[in-house]
Amino acid sequence: YSSAASDVYKRQVWGIGCDATNSEAVEKVFRLKQRPDHKAMIVLVSSADEAARYVRDFPEIAYDLIEFSEKPLTIVYDHGVLLAPQLLGPDGSVGIRVTNEAFSNALCRRLRRPLVSTSANLSGQPAAAVFSDISEEILDGVDYVVDYRRDDMRRSTPSTVMKLSSDGEFKVLRP
């Protein structure tokens, strides 16, 4: 991805993504979505081992939580590293999901980088569950729109979100 690249792709809902290690690309996504700086975006990776590269003191229990989760799972870790600073919370935390969705997983593997993952909508507007829900403003503002699953009318449920501390203690934030 170039410094300002972002694209639109289907995951649980239609999303905007970019290289999560590239501050300029991440900033472009914030501007496009008109999203306040304090509202974090999550990071997608292709495997638990890849997630561990972007977390200081990756808890061992995370491997089991990821492997045995029955639905998409976003884990908020205490200390993100090697990512664009805009993706870290004020306390240094970061939300990371190992994506099982075929396209986004393949994209992470192919690029060998984590991806920002945020819904393809303006901040405060409903998420785009189907391609036709995406506003022209979003479509015109990205560098590329993936030609994949545009006719997919299935509506998916959001991921489970949990906070997982370095010591292995966890709390479910969204079931």
Identify the residue ranges that each predicted region occupies.
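Residue-level signal for inorganic ion chemistry
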Residues: 10, 29, 75, 108, ...
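Flexible, glycine/proline-enriched loop segments at strand-loop-helix junctions
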Residues: 16, 90-97, 118-128
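Internal catalytic-core helix/loop-beta-alpha segment
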Residues: 72-115
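Oxyanion/phosphate-interacting regions
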Residues: 127-175
